[in-house]
Amino acid sequence: MASVPSAGCLLARNQYYRKASVSSGPSLTGPDSANFVGDDKTQLGLPKVAESTWWFKSFFQSVPVLNVKGEDQSACGGNGPGSRSKVPSGTNNHSLLQQEESQLLGEMADSGTVNRFRNSQTVKDKPRPFHGAPKDTNSPQ
């Protein structure tokens, strides 16, 4: 499985090669050294700072969260013909989940699934230890 380097590692590597390329370029002590500005760096094949960090900025940019309101529900299929329930405008996600849960539990209760589950989960007596487990001498009898 291939490993993906972190953004900081990529940025540090980019800066290392940029410094190495500038130092191995033409000498800056000649008569043209005063004319060597940032635009001249691009002529040496070095990317501009804005071009080298565009991916970094876009990676950490926040993604907008969908607004779950009545008018937005139709766009994501909330109140469409295939939806399970009509959602009133202005409800939040928590109440929507509770409504879905109660509807599903109601459907399960109609089929008897919930009652069978509840009956299997009820504990009538104190749980007994396993056959091979040693007795707890510290517990009251």
Curated annotation (Swiss-Prot):
Superkingdom per UniProt: Eukaryota
Recorded coiled-coil stretches: none
Any one GO BP annotation for this protein: cell differentiation
Pfam families found in the cross-reference section: PPDFL (PF15060)
Composition bias, Low complexity: 95-105
Region (Disordered): 72-141
Polar residues: compositionally biased ranges: 112-122
PANTHER family assigned: PANCREATIC PROGENITOR CELL DIFFERENTIATION AND PROLIFERATION FACTOR
Family the UniProt entry places it in: Belongs to the PPDPF family.
Protein name: Pancreatic progenitor cell differentiation and proliferation factor-like protein
Source organism per UniProt: Bos taurus (Bovine)
Highest classification ranks of the organism: Eukaryota, Metazoa, Chordata, Craniata, Vertebrata
